[in-house]
Amino acid sequence: MPRTHARGTARDRLLDAAEELFVERGIAATGVDAVLGRAEVSPATLYAHFPGKDHLVAGYLERRHERWRATWDAALERCGDDPDARVLAIFDALDDFPTATSTRGCAFLAAAVEVTEPEHPAYRWLAADTHLLVERLRQLAAESGAADPDALAAEILGLYDAALASRTRRTVAGDGGPAPLPCRALAASAVVRHRA
């Protein structure tokens, strides 16, 4: 494996390596030794930053959550004051997100399959991701004039999840894969249909 982490702090190299490996292999299938090798750091360096693998997983999801939030914030900023565009900005953010073509799809949904105990240090980031999606979509739906913001938010979230699944299936299948679902267009129709 070529060296990909020549720069940055040891903590950043650990998080970069963990992200690459968790996306490639999954969390449970990735051992600490693989992360250490990819990051080119010692076990002592890992434990100086993270008490163990569970906390490394939490650090990975925390950083991923902050990157996703920043990407979505930027997409919202580009929409200006257009309330309909702001509801749909989640799809723009998905297009802009650096790992939109991952074969594992959403890092949080993939991690939720492996991190199921609420006491796990990473669980709070799974909850934070869901909270961000639900609450922000509800707020944006209300701002768009939806008669039932909860219903519109739920529909947009379902279409967002479908967009993630569609991208994953297409990435796995390559060029011969199914056409991507028109989730953004379906969401735009939902915004109009839910208007008060």
Sequence positions of predicted segments:
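Amphipathic alpha-helical segments used for helix-helix packing
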Residues: 86, 99-121
